[in-house]
Amino acid sequence: MEQTRIQMFEQQIYPEIFAEVAGNVMDRFGKQKKEIIEEWETILQQYMDQLADLQEEEEAPSIQEIDFSFLYTSLEDKHAKFQIDSYGEGGRVSGESILTEYISADWIADGAKVLAERLAERAEQENLRGYVRAAEIDKLRLRAVRSLLLCLAVRFKYIIRDMIDFRSLARVQKEPCFLIQIGEYMDWMKTIYAVQPAVDIFNCEQDTDLRFRSFHAIHYNEKQFKAFNLSQSDFRDCVFTESSITDCLMNDCMFDGCVFERLCIESTMMKGCIFANCVFQETIMKEIVLSESDKESSILDYFAPAEFHNCEFREVRLENCNADNCIVKNCDASKLGLENSSIVGSGFEERKDKEGQDELF
């Protein structure tokens, strides 16, 4: 009987309370984002400069990995915090941290505290206090902290570049594969920034990790991109002609100054992508996901809507695409057609309202 009551509390009541608290924590994170970025930027700049100084004095090797690790033990301290560590070749599994620093994470601790209080209140209301004791609530509090960290990790990827002083980072000697990660101390880590060696998509080993790559001034002519995971890669001044992109993962990619001509992009995930100064010519997008729908969105797996800035659309069609809430600024097109595509809350919708038709601009 006791175990059944506890399971009911964990499976029905905890998720409800966690969703509410997590939403509040994410709202607070969003409202305080500027202050959080400034705090992290200051500490990370000092940290990078210290690393570079150690390297100049030949007291530190080149760096492969910098980790932001949440310390569960700090939940009992006055201020919860992340520990910043850096590691040489092989990362954290191959050696000790070269330099350690700390940065506050009070918003996580505050959220965990509120959650524990609400769980205790709800247990009292449901006459379950005799079953859901302090130890059980503390276990759920720690579970919530892990989930909150996952929530934050998928959002940090969008602000980490604002936190980094790239001049300080440039001083640091880095391994060819360099990562910045966030997660739990001595546990899981999620990569939020990376510098990877150059790679040829169509001339590399089959198991090559194509994420976080940079592709500059490459002409892809009559190429078939099939089932590639190119998420968070950077395409600059690339040209795609007479080619196809099918069943690919391209979430959070950056396309700057790229040309897409006589191209078919189909069944591909492009959530969080930024298209800047791009030209789309005689291109069809079929069943492309540019943003998450309300049904698909998850607080634990967050993607920003795609953005289009200073782009040109010429003889382009979006068929059965999801482009809700996509940002469209300073874009010019001779013809952009929409067929069974969702554009609620996006810049495409605003322009459609002005024109009053599916063929925009």
Each model region followed by its residue ranges:
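Intrinsically disordered, low-complexity regulatory segments enriched in Ser/Thr/Pro
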Residues: 74-129
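N-terminal alpha-helical "arm" segments
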Residues: 1-23
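Short N-terminal edge-element motif at the start of the domain
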Residues: 16-63
